[in-house]
Every structure is written in C-alpha cells, then in structure tokens.
C-alpha cells in the first residue's frame, strides 16, 4: 500500500529533545522501581492527575510549551498529589526489600515455576473433588488418551470437561466442539475464591 511512498527517517529522541528542550535521564533501574510503585499506588490514574486524553484537547494552545503551561496553571496540585502517592509506596517497598533474602527468593521461584505452572491442573482436581463429594461419588483425572477426547476427568462414571468462563466467549472457530458435559469456573485475579458453575446430570 505504501510501496510508492517516500520514507523519511528521523531520530525521534533527538527531535523530542529539540521540542521539550531537555532529555530527562534517570539512574539505571530507578524508572523500573518508580513504575512498579506507581502501578501499586495508582498515582497517575485519571482520578489523580486527570483524564489526559481529554485535557490535552481542552488546552487551547496546541504546542508542547502551551500544554505544559496550561496544565501546570490549572492542575499543578495533581502533580504533587501523584508524587506523594508514589513516594509513599516507594517507602513501603523499601521496607519490603528489607524482608527479602535468598530463601524468600527461592520460595518465590519455586512457587512460580512449579505451583503456578500446575495451577490449571490443581483447579481441575479441586473442582472434580468438590462436585464428586457433593454427589457422594468417586472422581479421577483423565488419562492422556481420554484428554485427546476433550475429557478432563470423571465424576462417578460421567466424563466431564473443565473450562474457564472465558472459554464461553471465544468465537466458535476458536472454541472446540465438545459433546460431553462441561463444568465452567472463574478465578478472578488476586482473589482467593474459585467459582464453579455446572448443571451436571449425575
């Protein structure tokens, strides 16, 4: 589509520096830490600093210097508010850093590599066990051969498939055709609860 177009190659960082008048530099790793603290503190969310996509259009002067002057005249307190929120979180992180030693790191790595990897399998076991005990039946996980038939496990003699709720929203071309009874589950991120949905005829 652009085969016949002329290409112009610019050093964006250099051009940006010409407009802003400076290139802000930070010591190694510091921006990663500040970014993480900001994510936790939610310091630059719209409710703190304003909805940037709207404010930039409200500014009557459509230049960098005009925008900077306008925002600082109207919302300079929001910069301070965001700074305070992030700074407080940095202090919390500093305190947490004092608690981290090699043994804690080893436990974290083990949890990530072993437990988190097996979370899907663990969820299947929990779901099968919960529903089977409720019905007074035995349960088991599927064999590799049974898995190839979309079976994740058995409750009594009933084969079942276990899928996350997000599976339901997939397009039919992505979603597999499953003829057996399906159990759905939802595990919200950072929630301790697992929600199970089924209408099994067992």
UniProtKB/Swiss-Prot annotation:
It catalyses: Endonucleolytic cleavage of DNA to give specific double-stranded fragments with terminal 5'-phosphates. InterPro entries: Restrct_endonuc_II_MjaI. One of its GO terms (molecular function) is DNA binding. GO terms for biological process: DNA restriction-modification system. The keyword Secreted does not apply. The keyword Nuclease applies. Its EC number is 3.1.21.4. Keywords: Endonuclease, Hydrolase, Nuclease, Plasmid, Restriction system. It comes from the Archaea. Transmembrane segments: none annotated. This is Type II restriction enzyme MthZI. It comes from Methanothermobacter thermautotrophicus (Methanobacterium thermoformicicum).
